[in-house]
Amino acid sequence: MEGWQRAFVLHSRPWSETSLMLDVFTEESGRVRLVAKGARSKRSNLKGALQPFTPLLLRYSGRGEVKTLRSAEAVSLALPLSGITLYSGLYINELLSRVLEYETRFSELFFDYLNCIQALAGTTGSPEPALRRFELALLGHLGYGVNFTHCAGSGERVDDTMTYRYREEKGFFASVVIDNNTFTGRHLKALDAREFPDVDTLRAAKRFTRMALKPYLGGKPLKSRELFRQFMPKRTVKTKKD
C-alpha cells in the first residue's frame, strides 16, 4: 500500500534496539502489522507520533504478513485521554487487536472507532455509553446481526414489560424465567436505539455485549478489562436524573 491513508496505532512493542513492531488500524486496509525501522532511535522524528490515539497519515510497503512503514505524520496531537478514559481507550484498542483479522477492510468501523475515541476525549461523565455503542457497532461490522425489535419466536414487536431470553445466533425469545441471559423489552429497545438513559439499561447493554463478544474473544481474558475493573470506581454512571 504505497498511498497515504489514515490510521491509528493500536499497540506497539520494541522489535530491535532501534525499531518498533506496530499493530495499526487503517481506514483502507484494516488492521496491519508494521515494522517501523529506526523509530526507537534518539534522532527519530517518529517516536512521538507513533502513539495510541494519535491520528496519523502513513504509507507502508511489503508483501508479507509484516509490512515496512515508509512514512508517518501526525495529523494532530493525540486525543486527550486520561484516567478512566485512557483505560477505556486501551480496552477498545485491545478489542480490535483480538477480533479483527489482518488486512480486512473496515472503513466504516474506522470512523466508529474515531467517533468513540473523540467521545471518550470529550466526556465529563461515564465512558460506558461510548463503549457500549462502539461494541454494538463492532458486532454489526463483524456480521453479528441481531433483531432487537421483534421476538424471534412470535415475530411480534417486543413489549416493554415482557422478558426475553437471548439465544446465540437466533435472537430473543419470550421467557417466564428471569436470569442473567434475559432482558426486558425496554432493554432491547434501548439496545436498538443505542441510547442508554439510566443505569439499568446501561448494565443490560453491557451484559449483552459481553455475551455477544465472547465467541470472538475465546477464553483468554482481556488485559485492559482487568485494569479497567481495578481503576473503575464503584459508581461512575450518572443518569439523566442526577
UniProtKB/Swiss-Prot annotation:
Highest taxon, organism lineage: Bacteria
Subunit structure: Monomer.
The protein's name: DNA repair protein RecO
Family (UniProt): Belongs to the RecO family.
Keywords, sorted A to Z: DNA damage, DNA recombination, DNA repair
GO cellular component: bacterial nucleoid
Job description of the protein: Involved in DNA repair and RecF pathway recombination.
